[in-house]
Amino acid sequence: MIQNQKIIDTQRVINYINSFLDNVRVEDIIQNSGADKLRVYPALFELEQSGFLEVVEREELGAPLIVMKRKNG
């Protein structure tokens, strides 16, 4: 069940990011995507590692503040 919820929340994050053409604030993803707020940062990390998105701006300690879908060259 936990694995299924992780997949569902990751898909919610993907769907939310896909609804924008440009940058997306992580705070907006947390508030509006429907994903559990505790799963958003791990999902963003996995999506960055997979090449789906890029982090445009980070906090001082490295947490993403603004992300965008990676444009395929």
Give short role names for the model-derived ranges.
Residues 1, 32-33, 52:
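Long, compositionally biased intrinsically disordered regions
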Residues 2-10, 23-25, 57-73:
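Short, cationic-aromatic polyanion-contact patches
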Residues 12-20:
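Short amphipathic alpha-helical elements of helix-turn-helix/winged-helix folds
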Residues 20-33:
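Short acidic, hydrophobic short linear motifs in intrinsically disordered regions
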Residues 29, 42, 59-60:
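Proline- and acidic/polar-enriched loop/turn elements at helix boundaries
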Residues 35-46:
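Short amphipathic alpha-helical interaction segments
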Residues 48-58:
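A short, conserved structural fragment
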